[in-house]
């Protein structure tokens, strides 16, 4: 096969994540590939919250156009940015091995979360993160902060914030985990649905699909599909406070989810056969809605 073209966002993290997939293509199949860098609408509108401009799907749409026009053979996404409903022409051919799922605190002077000063100013534009922070410490002042990892770190200094919340996965992929002050327990501070997972999207008719499919990680697929099933049942998006964490426990799958029902934050968990992972996601959603 000739060289593949892999579409991705322009940020350093997006490119690093794409390079992980490109290396795997080379190592497994001896296939060369190149990046196609795309500035998405979500990247262009950094001064407005995602909830106000249409949600995380804005990071995907422009890339899908490149796939549809066959300018790219595949695309690498952070699965937490991928809407649960894809247009019928596309599919997620593979979910690769998942990175650390946890959220982390990066604080000024490396001060642990519990020791942050009263009224400490913390940057995050995530409704999920902001609400969980307030549940843990109601005194905190939460301010919006968007942009890639580097931009947020710069804004933290410029705006003299006491800290920011980021996903561990991105920092680890960028080899910047040394700046992490503290990791949050994912069963206490629930991550975003599919956090830490990369997905390879392509046209259903793509000749490259057979290679992408062989890059799938079975445990990542189970946990991500379970969490996305939970999200789909609740019709969750970035307008919603929604999060989920799941892990394989032998033949079982354990999942805990969080959701906002009329201003009340509900957290529930479930354990069941991992082969019923899609149904477990639905059951957990129903369990939350029964409250």
From Swiss-Prot:
Per the annotation, how and in what number is the cofactor bound?
Answer: Binds 1 dipyrromethane group covalently.
Tell me the domain of life: Bacteria
User: S-(dipyrrolylmethanemethyl)cysteine is carried by which residues?
Assistant: 238
Q: Name the Gene Ontology molecular function terms of this record.
A: hydroxymethylbilane synthase activity
Q: What class of enzyme is it?
A: transferase
**Which family does the UniProt entry place this protein in?**
Belongs to the HMBS family.
Protein's job:
Tetrapolymerization of the monopyrrole PBG into the hydroxymethylbilane pre-uroporphyrinogen in several discrete steps.
Stated name of the protein:
Porphobilinogen deaminase
